[in-house]
Design a protein with these regions (language model features):
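Internal alpha-helical scaffold of NAD(P)-dependent oxidoreductase catalytic cores
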Residues: 73-83, 99-136, 147-185, 230
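Rossmann-like NAD(P)(H) cofactor-binding subdomain of soluble oxidoreductases
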Residues: 6, 15-16, 23-100
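NAD(P)-dependent Rossmann-like dehydrogenase/reductase catalytic/cofactor-binding core
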Residues: 173-235
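NAD(P)-binding Rossmann-fold cofactor-contacting core
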Residues: 1-13
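Short pre-catalytic strand/loop immediately N-terminal to key active-site residues, enriched for Gly-Thr
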Residues: 84-85, 133-138, 190-195
Length: 235
């Protein structure tokens, strides 16, 4: 692995039990070369490693994590005609609970299968058309920040009602995890699960009423759309 900071590369190499090298060494020998740079840095990186890649006689796959850059954008910035996978991971990937959207171009079925096998530990890998990657990123890439804000607000409510901060935070986070897993594992619509908790005249439906009065659904939708529109501006 390589990093702009040699010290950071060494630290990460020790943590991940791999070798710290420079970009040229990665470009010369890796089967899957991850381009983990900001969008504006892709062209400069490819200008440096392009000659090394061009000299290779074996197949390799470029994997881009640059937000907002489509497959054509990446090719215009130096990725040429080489096999290319565009991915959009999110922060929970760090603990194996991520959502990783991906789209392939010029990649064989065997190369895609090997990529999926090696990335399986990061979370759920979902194929997505290139033109929809920004939409996926607005939900899964930006979503953790929205969810964190919700957890913090829910915990604040718990504190206001008398819970300690640690208890309220743990309770809010675990409740979100449990509700999400219940939906995923049962396949039930979230609206149906919500209705199952809302007893007639009960406390939950009053809380739902307060959320609706505050524009909760609209605010969440607008957050996703705003993130999507910003991604479009970043191209």
């Amino acid at each position: 692995m390589a990093n702009r900071s040699a010290a950071k590369a060494e630290a990460l190499a020790q943590e991940l039990d791999c070798r710290a090298v420079d970009n040229a060494a990665v470009a010369a020998g890796a089967d899957y070369i991850f381009l983990g740079v900001k969008p504006y840095m892709v062209a400069g990186l490819m200008e440096k490693i392009g000659p090394v890649l061009a000299a290779r006689k074996d197949r390799f796959v470029l994997v881009s994590m640059a937000a907002a850059l489509t497959i054509p954008d990446l090719r215009e910035r130096g990725c040429g005609d080489w096999p290319l996978i565009r991915i959009m991971p999110n922060t929970p990937s760090a603990i194996g609970e991520g959502v990783i959207f991906y789209t392939c171009d010029g990649v064989t079925a065997e190369e895609e299968a090997a990529f999926l096998e090696n990335m399986a530990g990061a979370g759920r890998l979902l194929p997505l058309d290139d033109h929809l990657m920004d939409a996926g990123s607005a939900v899964a890439g930006c979503g953790p920040a929205f969810v964190d804000l919700f957890i913090e607000a829910m915990a604040d409510g718990g504190v206001a009602c008398g819970l300690t901060r640690p208890m309220a935070m743990e309770c809010a986070a675990q409740t979100l995890i449990g509700a999400a897993r219940l939906m995923l594992e049962t396949g039930r619509h979230p609206g149906a699960l919500k209705d199952a908790v809302c007893s007639p005249g009960g406390a939950t439906i009053q809380g739902v009423r307060a959320l609706e009065a505050g524009g909760f659904r609209s605010a969440v939708m607008e957050a996703v759309i705003a993130a999507y529109e910003k991604s479009a501006e970043m191209k």
